[in-house]
Amino acid sequence: MDGYVTRRLWLDRDPQALKDWQTLMQAAKLSDQERVDYTIGIYDGARLAATGSLDGKILKCLVVCAAYQSENLLTQVVMALLERLDQEGLTNRFVYTKPKNLPYFKALGFRLLAQTEALLFMEQGFPSFQDYLSYLTQHKVDSSQNGAIVMNANPFTLGHRYLVEQALSACGHLYIFVVSEDRSYFSAQDRFKMVQAGVADLANVTVLPSRDYMVSQATFPSYFLKERADLAVAQVQAELDAQVFKQFIAPSLEIAVRFVGEEPLSPVTQVYNQALAQAFGQDLDLKIIPRLEKDGQVISATRVRAAIQAGKLADWVNLVPQSTYHYIQSQDLLGQDVQREKVE
């Protein structure tokens, strides 16, 4: 490694580092708009020869300049990123990579979780995916027809409640997976509790966390970009997320049908629903439920959040169950400190 220098790239404050990084990303035909919070680079003099980034505990944007492919720089980048995760106490980590890189990452201790023609989804460390599947089997309920819903519930609305009721009428037991990723207006903990409260009066319902394995920053990061997402990228990610559910989540709980809401508002969620249908094929049933409307408009969490941010109680209080309203009020979640995103 004589002559090479490894250093952190401060993309948000070093214009030259950002330019070097963007040039290398574009040469590799990768998006330079990826969300990253830590980036390193290996320089050969003034030339950026290799780079890699972290987005939380996800390794991404791993690129080696074509002229340096024989220099083993990728290993140096990956090991430096893993060391950073060790320093932060993050013992469970993920990587998206191309299928050709499977042997390389397996040699570094990564386990293959799922794959599509374009992508591999791999994991290293603990707690692992197998630990999560074991957790799910502990909550398994014997039923003739198990169904599932995955929801962000940001917050839990009457539309979510309607989806749950419609699903329950078509299955014996319903598993509701609440998105665990903390990148929403309301925290993962608050959203989980709102869902629990919102379905507490219903029999044959089990509420579970999705952890990192359903609609997460690891499996489907485009979901959190909404209208800013590249739909072609979202399609590839959605296919992988769907495969994880089909191959592992559904069998662990003997889920036969998944319910989703019809999606007239979000192109990314629409892409996701299409990917589910394609991935499930004849193996799993996918039922699309028409959205509940009020005053000629679909009841959506986006609509509720906009009204909350505008301070218009009358515009949102009738769009959520009493349980959601009481939870938001009791936890003082109407203040500015709760806002993790702006409604655009």
Question: What residue ranges belong to the model's regions?
Answer:
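Short amphipathic alpha-helix that is part of the acyltransferase structural core
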Residues: 1-32
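Conserved GNAT acetyl-CoA-binding A-motif
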Residues: 85-98
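Nucleotidyltransferase catalytic core that binds NTPs
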Residues: 96-344
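A short, internal acetyl-CoA/4′-phosphopantetheine-binding micro-motif in the GNAT/acyltransferase core
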Residues: 59-70
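Conserved beta-hairpin
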Residues: 36-50
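Conserved acetyl-CoA-binding loop-helix of GNAT-fold acetyltransferases
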Residues: 70-83, 107, 160-165
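Short coil/loop residues immediately preceding or within conserved phosphate-binding loops
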Residues: 37, 59, 144
